[in-house]
Amino acid sequence: MRHDPMTPSTFDLFADAEPEQLPRREQIGEQSCVLRGFALPWLDRLLPALEAILAAAPLRQMVTPGGFIMSAAMSSCGTWGWTTDRSGYRYTRNDPQTDAPWPAMPAVFLALAQAAAHEAGFADFVPDSCLINRYVPGAKMSLHQDKDEASYAAPIVSVSLGLPAMFLFGGFERSDKSQRVPLLHGDIVVWGGVDRLRYHLSLIHI
């Protein structure tokens, strides 16, 4: 499960926004879909839980194995947290900044992830890690696959909060053409099964 939030002071940007007339559920692959506005009913519980996590494990810009500073700031919660440094990409049980365990995954995170996965056709999903990415305008990751997990059996559940974004969903080779999928506050993308290793990235646009 992943979250792409802005800072708490920017959540109210969407208070008066009118979402585009997009399908409630949009299939973007054989086993991948966008669930429009799926997270919105959960926000009253989701956002305070998110703030508590970031107070315990603040966002930070990590360094890639190649020595580059990532433009997206990150944190994690759950049994495992994703991290990167000059030693490589990996999951760790402890936050490298404090050597303390990552914050426990809040019950609302678990429930939302399971509800979205079930809606997308993935029953019995039990996430043990949540990567939190904060993108600001101009920040992005390169087109990539999520390959650091011990197993690819579970789907990816990605929750978008804050500014609109363009999600690029590609094929199984970096050179494959990517779909451009607009995402709004509260949208969730789920992909797994035969689509689990498709290339993807998110871009913030305003």
Residue ranges with predicted function:
Residues 2-74:
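N-terminal auxiliary "cap/dimerization" subdomain that precedes the catalytic jelly-roll/cupin core
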Residues 204-206:
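Conserved small/polar residues in nucleotide/adenosyl-binding loops
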